[in-house]
């Protein structure tokens, strides 16, 4: 018993550090394959500001592989744009991304295996001006620099793009962003990718959300240095909610909204049917009752369609 106790104490630090999901294809991994039907669309435009191949070099030579357009469209693992140390890319979309149930979008890098991980911070904006960063965590030891082609354990990485190999996206959930008056989580228009640099030198290193220096392959002093952005796939798209011409939202009361368990509908018109849809259009509930039970639905945004003899109207509801 004493021997087992001491063994547990010896292993505990490594157990605590390996606390996030594993590489793509392993049990429990959150990686999403590029052809997963979850993806509704892909980034349509991109702008890139390159960083240097080596941020500490006396002569500045920028990363140069690929062009911004390579970051648009579906992931393919080969058509990429390299950002260099601290380089950035800003992506926009045909439709905004919305804060739905679970992950809302995913970022793809082109790593050739599960351990050579070039990482990036991810930020989102609803106006293209004010960006807010997803809380990222890196538990990789900073005692030794990860070399130019060194290995990183994916289970020590969370909310950093580049966690998985090529063709597998790192998912991001908008609900994890901080609440702010300048951020409309239901209508994200821009996603920014920022290379983490990777050096453990505090003069140039970058910090995660809890103050850890992010240690990833460094130096990457070649043309494809830094994060290699392949694509950004959209899972939850924003849907404009419009009333039909002959019905007005003032004719209805829907409460409570947001709700924990049910919504009640009061109407001036006789209600024929009520449908509840996921934000992506999947019909989840059909009812003729004015009280709709949502207890079995996960937290997120939904569309409530009310049908009367005069027409129909759709309203967004939020399940907490």
Give the ranges of each region predicted by the language model.
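Exposed beta-strand and adjacent loop surfaces of beta-rich binding modules
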Residues: 15, 104, 117-121, 270-274, ...
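A domain-level signal for the mature, folded cores of soluble proteins
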Residues: 19-120, 133-240
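Glycine-centered tight beta-turn/hairpin loop motif at sheet-sheet or coil-to-beta transitions
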Residues: 86, 129, 310-311
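Surface-exposed loop/edge segments in extracytoplasmic proteins
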Residues: 128-135, 282-287
